[in-house]
């Protein structure tokens, strides 16, 4: 053991030891309790950032802690390798995304290994490998067979210059981020997964997720968006057709003054053929983004279609408007407008001089100026004929029943959740295993022809879909009739890859089936760690896919992740680290200067995992100083501990002196609190406990046999507490101080109940019920000793001067009251 702390050397030695001994490679073992710890897999950008390091350090602390607790721990790592960022990087560098991606993976794998994470690298997966996406294609075919994968027209953001679909974040001020062209709303044929078939189960099973943050549960509940409402039929004034409207407020039905339909509604398109003004309006609507948030905040605009519908109760004629705020994807693309009781309808009605008809008044009877603002709360019905003077809740049921009995409507449970559109008009993604044949139509690729390989030598230009230009890919033969046919050139949304990867880690070497029985052993994941930004999309899709895999008989649980931790961001100068802000701190430079253990210790100590972490250079220095202090202390006690650790009776040492028992009690109290905090994932306070223990031990001397044994016990506790957080130094010191074996093979320390027993009590001394002093006595002291100690207390003696004692009352373990 060197006198000075040399992190680069000891970290290299520890990592070589773990690799040579395959320390973190695990096998299924039914005799042991399993623990599956997983951090969200990264996109291989080429460089780890501090957000990565924090996420993975938290996960590693949890995994290593569970190893110490004797569990069979799986902690894997892989790469979310498909997607737009890689394609864009390839366009800029004029090279194939495959080359760029694999180079980055190699670099990032090395960086992760330098941090000493306890990953089972034998299970590494890369989502752009055909051995992975082959099974994703197989899964798509199973969904297609079950009717859960289907194709329909959908509205997208279309870049007319690059001839491609854009994500909302790729649009800047209404223009394509690369081409600068004005983005259009375009309807194209897209593949969807029928997540809506699982809406009710996805909502209900949120109640099972007892160890998820409430914020995430609420976000998912709102996203699924269950509501109880009524479907109402509005017949068109002319012809047999009708418009169906979904509403959660049938109590406002008598206040409808117009209907609004989406620009993409078939009726709007039909009217555009007969009106240039309507056609121009629809064209204008195409030049807006498709994101719901954007549509909600844009200026409300519309045009009269010239058509009328008939009110189902009053039989009044209602004008039908085409409005830019109505979403075709929501319900039926038709809204019943009640301007007096809906803010958006109110704004639109005032703009286009449409009538307001109040039908709800405040329940408390106070006046409301409906011209100034819509009254949106429940209340009492007015101007509603036979439903007048009824409260909104009662009216909901009465009007719903009336509509049903008269064939004009029906109750319906509605979900805000829409089917998952997985088509991407991009190159760098999983090919959708579908063939189009002029004779046979849409034909799924036979399973024995999987995988449909993505050509990896393409250099994308950013114009259109490269697969449409690659004849060797899209030209094929129909598997049914053997005539010339074409492949689907859309690729899958990368959220598909990340929706089932956690299960594939269980059996990445399996080439006969998607998942084998090992998946049932390891899933569900016991602890999942990732950012709150994935609360809805990724986590919801993974929950959906888990239920699909369960229904296919591949898994036997309902949910993918038992416990979820959403770690906070890493900030510097109060802002999230980013290259554009110039506030990035690179992990590599810190590891080189201080070592990986210092980086890990700072990240764990600086803040609780779920809170944001403010970067501090002085905090990093402080972590480094602590590890140097620990090293220096260990070097000083090395010879004494090596000698003690060779003794057979070292673990049965009895401390007799009160001061030694008190010191041992302090150490075990720190351990007790650390164990509580470890279970609560409050790792920063575990570090505080370790620092307290070291400060206690430093005051002791190895020249005293009792204190030397205290140092040995305390150091053994300290190193194991630190082992998940700073594994390299803990590994090295454990062996250098003669504790024997691998520290990871030793059980997690537990406080000795005897050590926690208090040896002395503090008792209150009263004279005639008034506090006059405090005394310390042994816990088992006799009544006589307690009385004698109390009567000899200095302040008590002063108050007893010239007084006659009538009696002394001793309340065991609490107080002494002297009556004078």
UniProtKB/Swiss-Prot annotation:
Disulfide bonds: none annotated. Gene3D superfamilies: 3.10.20.590, HUPs (3.40.50.620), Isoleucyl-tRNA Synthetase, Domain 1 (1.10.730.10), Valyl/Leucyl/Isoleucyl-tRNA synthetase, editing domain (3.90.740.10). ATP binds at residue 579. GO terms for molecular function: aminoacyl-tRNA deacylase activity; ATP binding; leucine-tRNA ligase activity. Keywords: Aminoacyl-tRNA synthetase, ATP-binding, Cytoplasm, Ligase, Nucleotide-binding, Protein biosynthesis. CDD domains: Anticodon_Ia_Leu_BEm (cd07958), LeuRS_core (cd00812). It is found in: Cytoplasm. A motif ('HIGH' region) lies at residues 42-52. A motif ('KMSKS' region) lies at residues 576-580. Its EC number is 6.1.1.4. Its main location: cytoplasm. GO terms for biological process: leucyl-tRNA aminoacylation. PANTHER family: LEUCINE--TRNA LIGASE, MITOCHONDRIAL, LEUCYL-TRNA SYNTHETASE. Belongs to the class-I aminoacyl-tRNA synthetase family. HAMAP family: Leu_tRNA_synth_B. This is Leucine--tRNA ligase.
């Amino acid at each position: 053991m060197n006198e000075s702390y040399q992190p680069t050397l000891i970290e290299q030695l520890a990592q070589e030891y773990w690799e040579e001994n395959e320390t973190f490679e695990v096998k299924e073992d039914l005799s042991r309790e399993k623990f599956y710890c997983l951090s969200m897999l990264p996109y291989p950008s080429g460089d780890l950032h501090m957000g990565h390091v924090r996420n993975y350090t938290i996960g590693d602390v949890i995994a290593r802690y569970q190893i110490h607790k004797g569990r069979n721990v799986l902690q894997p790592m892989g790469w979310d390798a498909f997607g737009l960022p890689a394609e864009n990087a390839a366009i800029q560098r004029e090279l194939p995304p495959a080359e760029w991606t694999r180079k980055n993976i190699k670099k990032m794998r090395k960086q992760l290994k330098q941090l000493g994470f306890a990953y089972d690298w034998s299970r590494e997966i890369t989502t752009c490998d055909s051995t992975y996406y082959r099974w994703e294609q197989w899964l798509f075919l199973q969904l297609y067979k079950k009717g859960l994968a289907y194709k329909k027209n959908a509205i997208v953001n279309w870049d007319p210059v690059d001839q491609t679909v854009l994500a909302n974040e790729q649009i800047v001020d209404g223009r394509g981020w690369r081409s600068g062209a004005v983005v259009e709303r375009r309807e194209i044929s897209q593949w969807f997964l029928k997540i809506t078939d699982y809406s009710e189960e996805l909502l209900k099973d949120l109640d099972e997720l007892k160890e998820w943050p409430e914020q995430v549960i609420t976000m998912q509940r709102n996203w699924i968006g269950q509501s109880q409402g009524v479907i109402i039929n509005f017949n068109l004034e002319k012809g047999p057709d009708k418009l169906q409207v979904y509403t959660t407020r049938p109590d406002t039905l008598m206040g409808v003054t117009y209907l609004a339909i989406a620009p993409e509604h078939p009726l709007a398109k039909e009217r555009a053929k007969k009106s240039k003004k309507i056609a121009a309006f629809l064209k204008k609507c195409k030049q807006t983004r498709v994101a719901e948030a954007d549509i909600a905040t844009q200026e409300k605009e519309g045009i009269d279609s010239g058509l009328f519908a008939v009110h189902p109760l009053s039989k009044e004629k209602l004008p039908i408007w085409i409005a830019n705020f109505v979403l075709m994807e929501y319900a039926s693309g038709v809204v019943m407008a009640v301007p007096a009781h809906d803010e958006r309808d109110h704004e639109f009605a005032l703009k286009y001089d449409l009538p307001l008809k109040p039908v709800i008044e405040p329940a408390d009877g106070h006046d409301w100026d409906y011209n100034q603002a819509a009254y949106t709360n429940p209340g009492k019905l007015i101007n509603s004929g036979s439903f007048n003077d009824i409260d909104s809740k009662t009216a909901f049921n009465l009007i719903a029943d009336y509509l049903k009995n008269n064939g004009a409507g029906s109750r319906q449970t509605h979900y805000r959740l829409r089917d998952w559109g997985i088509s991407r008009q991009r190159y760098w993604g999983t090919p959708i295993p579908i063939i189009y044949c002029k004779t046979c139509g849409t034909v799924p690729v036979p399973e024995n022809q999987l995988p449909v390989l993505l050509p990896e030598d393409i250099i994308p230009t950013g114009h259109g879909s490269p697969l449409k230009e690659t004849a060797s890919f899209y030209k094929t033969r129909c598997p049914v009739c053997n005539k010339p046919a074409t492949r689907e050139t859309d690729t899958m949304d990368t959220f598909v890859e990340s929706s089932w990867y956690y299960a594939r880690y269980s059996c990445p070497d399996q080439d006969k089936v998607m998942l084998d029985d090992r998946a049932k052993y390891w899933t569900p994941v016991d602890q999942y760690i990732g950012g709150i930004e994935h609360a809805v999309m990724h986590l919801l899709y993974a929950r959906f896919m888990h239920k699909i895999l369960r229904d296919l008989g591949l898994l036997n649980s309902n949910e993918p992740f038992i416990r979820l931790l959403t770690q906070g961001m890493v900030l510097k100068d109060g802002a999230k680290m980013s290259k554009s802000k110039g506030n990035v701190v690179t992990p590599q430079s810190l590891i080189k200067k201080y070592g990986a253990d210092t980086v890990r210790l700072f990240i764990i100590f600086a803040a609780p995992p779920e809170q944001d972490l403010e970067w501090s250079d002085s905090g990093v220095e402080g972590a480094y100083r602590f590890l140097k202090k620990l090293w220096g202390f260990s070097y000083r006690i090395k010879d004494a501990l090596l000698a003690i650790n060779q003794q057979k009776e070292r673990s049965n040492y009895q401390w007799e002196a009160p001061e030694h028992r008190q010191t041992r009690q302090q150490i075990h109290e720190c351990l007790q609190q650390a164990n509580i905090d470890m279970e609560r994932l409050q790792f920063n306070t575990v570090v505080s406990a370790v620092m307290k223990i070291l400060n206690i031990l430093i005051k002791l001397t190895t020249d005293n046999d009792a204190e030397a044994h205290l140092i040995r016990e305390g150091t053994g506790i300290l190193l194991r507490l630190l082992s998940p957080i700073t594994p390299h130094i803990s590994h090295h010191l454990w062996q250098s101080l003669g504790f024997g074996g691998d520290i990871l093979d030793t059980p997690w320390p537990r406080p000795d109940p005897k050590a926690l027993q208090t040896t002395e009590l503090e008792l209150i001394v009263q004279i005639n019920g008034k506090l006059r002093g405090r005394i310390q006595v042994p816990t088992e002291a006799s009544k006589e000793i307690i009385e004698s100690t109390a009567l000899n207390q200095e302040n008590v003696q002063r108050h007893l001067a010239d007084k006659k004692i009538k009696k002394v009352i001793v309340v065991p373990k609490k107080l002494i009251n002297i009556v004078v």
